[in-house]
């Protein structure tokens, strides 16, 4: 969806909420939150993530009725359709574009594509999905390997590993669990050891908790 967050019609959103939720105080508070942004939904507000998904809820139901769409996946405003017939997928794409414009007052991005998975993988949510295996997106994998080399050098030189570095690498390692990555783990993760990274994060968490208790105790005194 083109500029999704900024293009959400707030009055229509409140109208849609009012059909589901009868609590006037909640609706009023939600409207006041929406008013803090010049237009659409504010990126970063926790409630706006939920509201964005709610706004496209009817589209999800509509897609299930389209001929030729066997499966569909949506992550926020990124939508993927799967089907055996190319012409039917093109018709489904046109129907979705019309629905977005007429019912939700949104515009579909012009970079949509229709292609067979036999020819190329699906690049989606940080991964590359092939027919029978999944890999991490190339640029994400390169960042991961650089982080591993950086941490490995620090360990070999007995240097301190920063909390941000450890937590960031743990996040990348977590991504590996969702793709075919046995060789990558053996080559890059095993020489480092996840235990060392977790220990850095755990020690920093304890330090922050202790600092918070000290501030609270000082304020109470």
Give the role of each language-model region.
Residues 36, 90-94, 108-221:
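Right-hand nucleic-acid polymerase module
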Residues 64-67, 104, 152, 156:
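Secondary-structure transition/hinge residues
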Residues 68-69, 105-106, 127:
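Short aromatic/hydrophobic-glycine micro-motifs
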Residues 1-76, 80-96, 115-121:
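Conserved polymerase palm-domain catalytic core
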Residues 21, 97-106:
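A common structural junction motif
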């Amino acid at each position: 969806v083109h500029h999704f967050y900024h293009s959400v019609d707030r009055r229509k959103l409140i109208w849609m909420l009012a059909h589901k939720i009868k609590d006037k105080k909640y609706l009023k508070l939600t409207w006041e939150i929406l008013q803090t942004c010049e237009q659409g939904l504010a990126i970063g507000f926790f409630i706006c993530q939920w509201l964005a998904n709610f706004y496209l809820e009817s589209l999800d139901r509509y897609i299930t009725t389209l001929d030729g769409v066997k499966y569909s996946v949506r992550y926020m405003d990124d939508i993927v359709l799967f089907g055996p017939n190319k012409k039917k997928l093109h018709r489904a794409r046109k129907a979705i574009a019309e629905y977005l414009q007429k019912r939700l007052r949104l515009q579909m991005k012009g970079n949509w594509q229709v292609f067979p998975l036999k020819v190329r993988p699906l690049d989606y949510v940080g991964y590359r999905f092939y027919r029978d295996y999944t890999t991490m997106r190339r640029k994400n994998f390169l960042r991961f390997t650089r982080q591993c080399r950086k941490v490995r050098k620090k360990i070999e030189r007995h240097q301190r590993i920063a909390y941000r570095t450890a937590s960031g690498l743990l996040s990348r390692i977590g991504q590996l669990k969702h793709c075919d990555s046995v060789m990558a783990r053996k080559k890059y993760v095993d020489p480092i050891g996840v235990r060392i990274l977790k220990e850095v994060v755990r020690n920093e968490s304890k330090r922050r908790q202790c600092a918070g208790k000290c501030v609270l105790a000082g304020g109470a005194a």
